[in-house]
Structure formats: structure tokens, C-alpha cells
Curated annotation (Swiss-Prot):
Functional note: Involved in the binding of tRNA to the ribosomes.
Organism per entry: Amoebophilus asiaticus (strain 5a2)
InterPro entries, per the entry: Ribosomal_uS10, Ribosomal_uS10_dom, Ribosomal_uS10_dom_sf
Assigned protein family: Belongs to the universal ribosomal protein uS10 family.
Keywords annotated in UniProt: Ribonucleoprotein, Ribosomal protein
PANTHER family: 30S RIBOSOMAL PROTEIN S10 FAMILY MEMBER
Domain of life: Bacteria
Keyword Zinc: no
Protein name stated in the entry: Small ribosomal subunit protein uS10
Keyword Metal-binding applies: no
Subunit structure: Part of the 30S ribosomal subunit.
Length: 101
């Protein structure tokens, strides 16, 4: 039976996370492993409301939004080449990677 590796990616920038997911998929496919994904997970949006004025005018407010994007990649492999390829892979600093075997 093949070993299952689950990789979760998180980022505030969707372009960065898509490029990182593509790098991972390409590196794993070069080792002849089976890849499922990248699967887009629901994005989380946080909205922050602040007063524009430091003293009065409570009706005047400004809203800021912070979106967190997530992707899921499942890898099915028997070889150690796949794990070595993942360890040597360099990803941008704006992407959080969590790996479960």
C-alpha cells in the first residue's frame, strides 16, 4: 500500500499559493508519484472596521479585509525519492506549509 502524504498550504496572496502548489505538484510528478490536487479549500475573510477620525464623527468608518487562502494536496507514493524532492523544494516565504504523513 502506498504511503499518503497530505500537504496543506496557507497564504494571504492567492497568486503565491497557486504557484507554490504548482511547484509541489510538478516536483512530485517528476518522481512518478500519484498526486491529488491542488484542491482549493474555503478562504477565510476577516473584516476590520476602524474609525477614520481620532476624536468624533463615529459615522465615518473605514473597513479593511484580510483574506486567507488555502490549498490541499494529497500524494500517494512508495518511494523515498518523493520525500527527498519535497525536502529540496524551495517555496516563497509568504506560504505556510504543513505536512502530515
Amino acid at each position: 500500500m502506498a504511503q499518503k502524504i497530505r500537504i496543506k498550504l496557507k497564504s494571504y496572496d492567492y497568486n503565491l499559493i497557486d504557484k507554490s502548489a504548482e511547484k509541489i505538484v510538478q516536483a512530485v510528478k517528476n518522481t512518478k508519484a500519484v498526486v491529488s490536487g491542488p484542491i482549493p479549500l474555503p478562504s477565510k475573510k476577516e473584516v476590520y472596521t476602524v474609525l477614520r477620525s481620532p476624536h468624533v464623527y463615529k459615522e465615518s468608518r473605514e473597513q479593511f479585509q484580510l483574506s486567507t487562502y488555502k490549498r490541499l494536496i494529497d500524494i500517494y507514493s512508495n518511494s523515498s525519492k518523493t520525500i527527498d524532492a519535497l525536502m529540496k523544494l524551495e517555496l516563497p516565504s509568504g506560504v505556510e506549509v504543513s505536512i502530515k504523513a
